Amino acid sequence: METAHGFAAPAVSALARGIREYSLFQAVLLVMDRLRQEYPGLGDEALYDQLEFQANPSLGFPGSDVDRVEFFEERGMLRARLRFNLIGLFGASSPLPAFYSEQALGDSEEGNPTRNFLDLFHHRLHRLLLPIWRKYRYRVSFQSGEIGRAHV
């Protein structure tokens, strides 16, 4: 994985190599922290817009929540693509008939239209999961050094 961001490249590749060790939400937060280092002026919503979510098309039993993360540059901005093993419309956890998963497994020179279409829904679904998780995990709504609203 090559990046044009000099000294930050080892940090990106180290995160990409070890991403399987983290849970779904930990991985998203780590990737957002990495993007925050690259773009300190962006807010959480703008950083979250730099993430792209996909489902893993593999039919094998997943060994972790996150399959992989890849960092890429698009329109001069560093972005991240996360591939998850949980909650997908194709792959091992799919609620759809196996036909769709088998069709999503195939690759051709111009890509896979079935996978690309269903990934639109995966992206939207996974974009909703982190705010829901944060809402019901009181401790993650605070950053270090902050004082809670109840104490003000």
Q: Could you say what each language-model-derived stretch is?
A:
Residues 150-152:
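Conserved small/polar residues in nucleotide/adenosyl-binding loops
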